[in-house]
Amino acid sequence: GLWRLQGPGGVVMAMFYVDDGLVAARTAAEADALVALVASIFEIRSMGEPRDMLGISITRDRTARTITISQPDKAKALAEAAGVAGEQRRVPMSPEVFAGLRAARDGEVMADRDVFRSQLGMALHMQQCTRPDCSVAVHALAPYASAPSQVHHDALLDVITYIGSTADLGITYGRKALAVETYCDANFASCLDTRRSITGWGVMMYGGAVSWSSKKQPTTATSTMEAEYQACGAVAREVISMIKAFDELALLCADFPILGPLTIFCDNKAALTLCKERKEGQRAKHIDIIHHFARDHVASGELQFVY
């Protein structure tokens, strides 16, 4: 759970997960006061400066004023368990492998399903916490967890090799201005099994990623414009929900401003036009209303899409 308290110097945040917790405050005195308050009710132990939380390493550089989160130990353990420790790889998945992924056919050599699922689950956890660079590759393999072929397992081992050889990579948040930077894109009809497109988006704050996704679209797009428009709707839902959460936590203040419409970058001009205008031509009349979410929030002034 996440709790917010109003201290004399500003907002104090406390996050707890089972028996682990973090406290964030403007001053050490305010953080210590909250810890003392909790200690008066429950038996707790203060560990001082946070170094690790739920397997996520937290590195703070006070000189550079940055915080980096990473999972080097988990990355190395995953590579060791998969038998690829020490091997090197520069990308999680090659474009050729990604473009050729499809369900196993009769006669193909199948992989051990339990082993595949176990390794995939660990890779999914890492990409969800600190490794957005692996999101596309890991989610491309997830649909084959019920019947993985050896081709799928080989591709997964490539991803794990990359994770292990880049174990120290993480996300760094620094002194860069708050400015929320959001990007979205779509890979048209890239799934060979369903011919559905894949939506990808990322939200950046203080120079680091705070939210990201690579996911197959819920409906089949018949054009690149429609695929990109669906991506716009998906990222709009995420951004709006984040802003509402910030508002509920009273984070939208002088020290945490979000002024004017949030900008989302998209590289398809036809999709941008559809986001801004309520005129649908013959090529857009069939698009499901769920994907018009973005357009409504552009009209309200909360969002703006930029090429």
Residue ranges and their predicted role:
Residues 1-307:
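Long, low-complexity, charge-biased intrinsically disordered regions
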